[in-house]
């Protein structure tokens, strides 16, 4: 359907189609669509984890249609929903006429993508570049898990799109740091090679879940933790710089902790990744190894 419509596509991290639809997909779709809201948005499948889906609540000019097996609109505002088996519904549509890129989004996206790739090269130790590098290694797994907001946003915008990664799960929400490692272990329980990417506060909040490791089937598991010294998303929120230092500390919860002791406590191999070259440690992981990879980005490059 996407290839027939030839319209711009937001290939959500959890869709399993990011790589297959790369020729139609928008890079940094959240920002691009906020600045250029489409007149019509067609959602196929489950509710996306991308930020723009939440922004639709405040963009009533965009008419939303959903085709979903659950019947759940995923929006608090009015929208149209078609419920049923996706394959049957799409087959019933028959041939569709191409719509094309009526708003010129792909042209704008092309410029953004070129700039993004240049920045990833010039800032190799930024959070964004580290997520790109981590995604390249994670592509060899049969399961990928993302939690909470920033890992999901980064994956949508910066993860590799060359190697298909069909089994991607994500969890985010108002209490999004709760139970994320538990969620990863549950998702990966039957996987032979699985990868997860979470934030530092998220990992601290559920680190005791790693006690479950001996109860799981054998398999290689890599838990990637972005340690940016606190809740990095709260540093980037609009108006964050106008708060008092005390309020910023309450929001960000800054810390100087390492995750090495947590890895040792639960018998995991610990890897510290501070530079692009440090990712070489992920090249040859032992079979059935349990790894905690602490990604420690450069804040100046990130900003």
Locate predicted features.
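Glycine-rich, anion-gripping cofactor-binding loops and their flanking helix/strand elements
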Residues: 1-65, 163-189, 193, 204-211, ...
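Redox- and metal-dependent alpha/beta enzyme cores, enriched for Fe-S-associated oxidoreductases
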Residues: 1-21, 142, 154-158, 220, ...
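Short glycine-rich anion-binding loops that position phosphate/pyrophosphate groups of nucleotides
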Residues: 14-15, 46-49, 70, 149-151, ...
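Short acidic-hydrophobic, aromatic-tinged amphipathic segments that line or gate anion-handling sites
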Residues: 23-29, 79-94, 255, 269-275
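Redox-cofactor binding/interface segments in oxidoreductases and associated redox assembly factors
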Residues: 42-44, 66, 146, 196, ...
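Terminal amphipathic helices with adjacent charged low-complexity linkers/tails
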Residues: 64-103
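Active-site diphosphate/adenylate-binding microenvironment
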Residues: 107-191
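Thiamine diphosphate
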Residues: 154, 159-303
């Amino acid at each position: 359907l996407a290839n027939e419509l030839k319209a711009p596509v937001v290939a959500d991290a959890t869709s399993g189609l990011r790589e297959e639809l790369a020729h139609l997909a928008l890079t940094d779709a959240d920002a691009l669509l906020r600045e250029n809201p489409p007149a019509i948005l067609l959602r196929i499948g489950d509710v996306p984890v991308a930020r723009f889906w939440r922004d639709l609540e405040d963009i009533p000019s965009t008419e939303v249609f959903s085709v979903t097996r659950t019947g759940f609109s995923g929006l608090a505002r009015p929208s149209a929903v078609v419920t049923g088996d996706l394959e049957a519904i799409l087959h019933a549509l028959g041939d569709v006429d191409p719509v094309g890129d009526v708003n010129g989004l792909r042209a704008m996206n092309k410029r953004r993508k070129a700039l993004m790739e240049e920045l990833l090269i010039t800032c190799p130790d930024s959070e964004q570049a580290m997520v790109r590098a981590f995604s390249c290694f994670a592509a060899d797994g049969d399961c990928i898990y993302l939690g909470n907001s920033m890992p999901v946003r980064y994956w949508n915008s910066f993860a590799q799109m060359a190697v298909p990664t069909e089994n991607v799960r994500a969890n985010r929400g108002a209490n999004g740091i709760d139970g994320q490692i538990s969620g990863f272990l549950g998702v990966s329980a039957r996987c032979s090679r699985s990868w997860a990417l979470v934030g530092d506060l998220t990992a601290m909040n559920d680190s005791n879940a790693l006690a479950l490791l001996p109860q799981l089937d054998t398999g290689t598991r890599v838990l990637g933790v972005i340690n940016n010294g606190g809740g990095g998303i709260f540093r980037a929120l609009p108006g964050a710089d106008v708060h008092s230092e005390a309020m910023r500390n309450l929001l960000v919860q800054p810390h100087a902790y390492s995750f090495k002791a947590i890895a040792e406590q639960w018998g995991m191999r610990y890897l510290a990744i501070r530079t692009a070259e440090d990712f070489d440690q992920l090249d040859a992981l032992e079979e059935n190894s349990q790894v905690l990879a602490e990604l420690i980005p450069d804040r100046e490059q990130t900003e």
